[in-house]
Structures are given as C-alpha cells and as structure tokens.
Amino acid sequence: MPLSPRPLLVAATAAAAALALTSCTSREETPAAPSSGGGPAASAQSVAPSADGCTLEKTGYAKVDLKTAVVGFSQSEKEANPFRIAETQSIKDEAAKLGIASDKLLVTNAQSDLNRQISDIKSLLDRGAQLLIVAPLNSDGLQPALDAAKAKKVPVVTIDRKVTSQPCTDYLTFIGSNFVEQGKRAAQAMVKATGGTGKVAILLGSSGNNVTTDRTQGFKDELAKTTGLSVVAEQTGEFDRSKGQAVMEQLIQSHPDITAVYAENDEMGVGAVNALKTAGKTPGKDVKVVSIDGTRNAVQLIADGSYNAVIESNPRFGPLAFQTLQKFESGEAIPASIVITDDQYDETNASQKVGNAY
C-alpha cells in the first residue's frame, strides 16, 4: 500500500523546540504546531547544538559518511502489522533517497522474540554495520546488544519504543511519540464520543514496554477528570487484531453493558469492531471505539461510521532517523529524546484525510 508523503512533526524535548520534518525540504522556519489539515507541513527546523546534547566528540566515535556507510536496521515485530510495514518501508525509502546502496542497508526482523533481536543486532555489527537504527521489542532487555554496539563505537538511534538504558552512553537518542499524551488525547476523544458517560473496556497492548504503560496511564489520568465514565474491564490483546477480537468477545460476555472501547492500537480496535458486529452490536454507535495508530483500516472505519476516533502514532521514522544520524556525524548535538507530535482522525476529517493513513 502506498505511503502518504505527509511528514512527521517533531518536538525535540531537550532543546525545548519543535521540529517538523518533511522528505522534500531542509529549510529552517519557525517551530511548527501539529497540523490539523491533510496537506504536507513545509517546515524543518534544526535542533540547536547544546552542551546537554550528545555529540560525536563527546562519544569519541569516529566520523562516518552516511552515504557510503553500512547501516543496520533491526525491526522488532513481524510485518503483519501495518505500523511495522510502514516503519520498515520508510527506512528503506529514505535510505534509497539518500543514495545508500541497497547492499549497504542491512535489515533484520526479530519476529517478536527479544533474544532474536539481541542476536540480530549483534549479527548486524558482525556484518559491518557502522550505524544502527533499532525499533526495540521491549523497553528492557536489549542491554547486551547495546553494549556490543558501544564496544564497536557504533551509534544507535532507537525509534518508537524507549529503552531503559542511558542515552548518549548506551544509545544515541530515542525518536518517538509522547505516549502519555496519546493516551490523554484518546480519553478526550472518548469523552467527546460518549458525551462523558458510559462504561469503558480497555484493550491493553503487550506488556514490558513503555508504549502500553504510558498509553494506559495517560488515558486513565485524563478519564479520571470525568465522573460519568468508568473503566469496567481491561485485558491485553497484545497489539494484535485476532487477539483483540478474542478478548473483546470475552468482554462482551462478561460485561454486556460496555458502551465504549479504548484500544491501545488500531489492530486491536479493528478486532474489537469485528467482535461487536458478530455480537449484533453497532460499533461507533452502540459502542464507541477509540484507538491509537492511524492505520488506513481504522481511519476508513471512522469514515464509514463504525469507529469514533484514532490518535495517530506516525510510523514513518525514516527521514528523521537518517537526518538525526547526519546531524550527529556532522558534529551537532543530539537531544536524548526527539518527540514527534501526532495527528488525529475523527468524523470531521477521516474521509478527507484517509489518504494520510498507512
């Protein structure tokens, strides 16, 4: 499925400045706010060098020419998930755009196995990777792989999930969303969809990573401000459509009075919709559905009236990941976290913006 050229909008937390990246511009402008429209945002502001940031000099690593370097990308999960498909494709597309030869981009997939991801990263290093981009499976457990990269003085950019290791020591930086904020925005969308009353079921993501923890915290903290909505059930669907559907089927039986579902990714949300339809309920109306990601399937369901809102979590990390590596190699300071700001889909814009989804 073709990817929309809509950019990632980013905010570098350590620099207290917003970043917005597109694949077609490198000019500096004033910091950009999150886009509310469907068109591409045109700003791309650099992160100012800072004593608090991580620099090539501070790490003592040798300078590498990105265009001729061997770059390794470690994907964490099987690419049956639209997020992972788009994420990997974005890395490949940006590498090609930069003129990196296909045999200089090494890609592995851990198939949701932590030990395999550790082995994959070590294998990438053994195969000569000079720069690494890693989509961690879990927040914990990758230290042996990060130690191996550090021993070879290979910078590591982590994307999507934050690891508990030390930035600028064990890895260069984290690029990803503010997952607590995503949860809060999902709760706000739920309040709007339900009118602030009802019984909510939460389909949790997989355990052991900050995405699930933060999206749950943000949602519950925000929902607590509304007295008419209560969480009556929560169970993990492992970020998987079929598991989300199975969990929803169970929850319909045990809690037939559920009036709203918060799924911590779209795949589980789509699974919940399938379960609700099978049970004779009308998702989007009888039972409100809000999730996080921005997949085309979920956004189309909003347009069709079977879903209520999606908070985007943009997987197109390629341009920003490579831009960050380029800045690091040129001597600029890189903040510990680069946080992207995500869009939102609901009944007011889904039909117009479905082309931006992945």
Map each language-model feature to its residues.
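Short beta-strand elements at the ligand-binding edges of bilobed clamshell
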Residues: 109, 165-189, 202-203, 234, ...
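Extracytoplasmic "Venus flytrap"
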Residues: 46-90, 94, 98, 105-119, ...
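Hydrophobic alpha-helical
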Residues: 134-150, 219, 233, 237-300
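Short, solvent-exposed amphipathic alpha-helices that sit
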Residues: 83-98, 182-186, 210-229, 243, ...
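Hydrophobic alpha-helical segments within soluble ligand-binding/sensing domains
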Residues: 56-59, 66, 71, 92, ...
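Flexible loop/hinge segments that line or gate small-molecule binding clefts
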Residues: 140-181, 199, 295-303, 345-354
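C-terminal motif of bacterial Sec signal peptides marking the signal peptidase cleavage site
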Residues: 19-23
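Hinge/cleft segment of the Venus flytrap/periplasmic-binding protein
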Residues: 11, 25, 33-68, 203, ...
